[in-house]
Every structure is written in structure tokens, then in C-alpha cells.
Amino acid sequence: VAKALLEFEADKLRLYPDPAALELREAIAAAVSIPEHPVAADQVFVGVGSDDVLALAFLTFFNSKKPILFPDITYSFYDVWADLYGIPYRTPGLDERFRLKKADYLTENGGIIFPNPNAPTGLMENLDTIEEIVAKNPDSVVIVDEAYVDFGGVSALPLVDKYENLLIVQTFSKSRALAGMRIGFAIGQKKLISYLNDVKFSFNSYTMNRLTIA
């Protein structure tokens, strides 16, 4: 980061940044790819921090009259966005071990979101649980908020190839210690990412500045 800032050509600040942030998306795709599960740049969506990405995801995917589902103990902004966008929601309780009760997420819904690890509890759901929730909700987008995944646990990124309704959201603010750069990103299949871009570009094409992209 320091090297990129030192080498940045200040004269470029007179120009608008790339609205698609292609170089940044290519770099993120390369960073999260593994040989068994490569990620392409067009599977990456970037925003000004993960809150920006999550808010756009709520606006894009949670537009049914059916309630969305998220745990009662969870990231505190989920209900804020739901209320802001007029999205009905239900908040199933956690079990006695403070983990998701899988059966609660296999009911009719307009979408699902949960943090993994859960921000307040620090507990991680295993991939089998996540996959079952995603697989049994083929008509709903399931968002896994992995803001803290690097502090312990396994990412659900390997499931993206298999499920077109799965969106993974991560951030540069926590384990990468770059909160001041305001970079959040989502990984999903190309079609899902294209829907996010359609909404984003409809009202704000330039969400990231040139220094951040550098």
C-alpha cells in the first residue's frame, strides 16, 4: 500500500477513476483464487467498504414481499437496511450454543443473510450448514457476510462455483487493517454480480477514488 501511494502519479487525480475498478477487481480475484476454485474479475463487485456492498445487495436482491431472514443476534445494520428499504424480515433465534438453527432457514423467505463468523459471538458455522441453507433455498439469494472470516474459520468461497444464489461479502477493514481505504467486495457467479452492477451504475458510477484503486 505504501509503495502504491509513493508511486502514484498525482496528476491522475484530475481524471475520473475507472467506474468498473477493473484493476482492483482483477487483483482481488487473483488474491482469493485457489487452483480448485479460480475467481474471475467479473465475479467480483467492489464498493466503498462492505457496508456499501451490503446496502446495495439488500436493494438489489431483497425485493420480495416475503420476509428475509437473519439471526436475532447479528450485525446491527441488517435491520437498519431492511427498515430503510421497506423489506419485511424475521429474526430467528440462535440455539443454546449461539449457532444458527438450520431449520429456521429452510422456510419460505425472500432472502437470507448472516455473518460468518457471527460478529457478536465470534462463532463460525461450518460449510456443511451453509451449503444446506444455500442448496435448499434455490429461489432466494443467500448472503454470507465474511467480514471476520480471516480471524478463524473457513470461507464459503468454494461454494460459489456450485450455487448461483450465493453471494460472499468481505472487507479490507478488519484483518487487512485498511479501514481508511474503504474497500469492500462481493464474490458470486457472474449473473449475480451483473445485477449488483446494474443497480450501482444506475445512480452512482464513481464509488471509488483513484488513490484507493491504486
Residue ranges and their predicted role:
Residues 37-44, 65-67, 146, 164-165:
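Short acidic capping loops at alpha-helix termini that bridge into adjacent secondary structure
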Residues 1, 50-51, 75, 116-120, ...:
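Short glycine-rich anion-binding loops that position phosphate/pyrophosphate groups of nucleotides
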Residues 1-49, 56:
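N-terminal small-domain helix-loop-helix segment of the aminotransferase-like
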Residues 60-115:
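PLP-dependent aminotransferase-like
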Residues 19-20, 165-214:
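PLP-dependent aminotransferase class I/II
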Residues 95-150:
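Active-site phosphate-binding strand-loop segment of PLP-dependent enzymes
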Residues 129-137, 158-162, 195, 199:
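Catalytic-core regions built around general acid/base machinery
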